[in-house]
Amino acid sequence: MIIVLSPAKSLDYDTPAHVPSYTKPAFVDDASELIDGLRKLSPQDIATLMDISDPLARLNFQRYADWSPTFSPANAKQAVLAFNGDVYEGFDAKSLSAADLDYAQQHVRVLSGLYGLLRPLDLLQPYRLEMGTRFANARGKDLYAFWGDRITRALNEQLETRSGVARVLVNCASTEYFKSVKPKLLAAPVVTPVFEDWKGGRYKIISFHAKRARGLMARYIVENRIAEPAALKDFALEDYAFDAAASNDSTYVYRRRIGE
């Protein structure tokens, strides 16, 4: 079983990493190619391309200038400890044991506009480049064209090493990021957990809650060493419960109703 997550825009490079071990990203050469293109942009170009404020654009202009193809703890931090958004509040990697992080290293992957596909302990230099950014490059009009089937092939390599267990990809990523994966080329079926909250007289996806819940699901899989999709139906953290009637073989729906 492989779990894929989206990255986070918010990053934490202030809190010291609680584990010393780290690995190097697989697609450094590809990331370097993107950085070369990003370095040609002015801060105003970046602000327009990414629809961000001028201060954020200047910050990322400097990040691209500082980025190096050589990774070390001096200029980078393990991805799962550097990302700091809603998903990663749910996953809460800083409280995982060394054994849990080792398991996550084998089973969790983070999709990234710049780095393609990251393992939890892959070193990450600070950046901003969302997968949906229409950044024209030598391979096409956007990042989906840039990555092509590279991410899918990398996932297949990892799925194909899973002998004796169910080969399945659990999609805990956003739609924007999962578009970088080509399900028809995957060597495994996809199961997508969907989290809905009761609001305004019906169940709906509330972004903040859904992101956090996807992180909780990834942590649940890691801590419980889940290997079969059926076991995902037992997930019941923070009052979510599996709804069989709303689910099917590829979409597992979890709902909660707190108050009225």
Curated annotation (Swiss-Prot):
One of its GO terms (cellular component) is cytosol. GO terms for biological process: response to hydroperoxide. Disulfide bonds: none annotated. Transmembrane segments: none annotated. Belongs to the UPF0246 family. HAMAP family: UPF0246 (MF_00652). This is UPF0246 protein Bamb_2261.
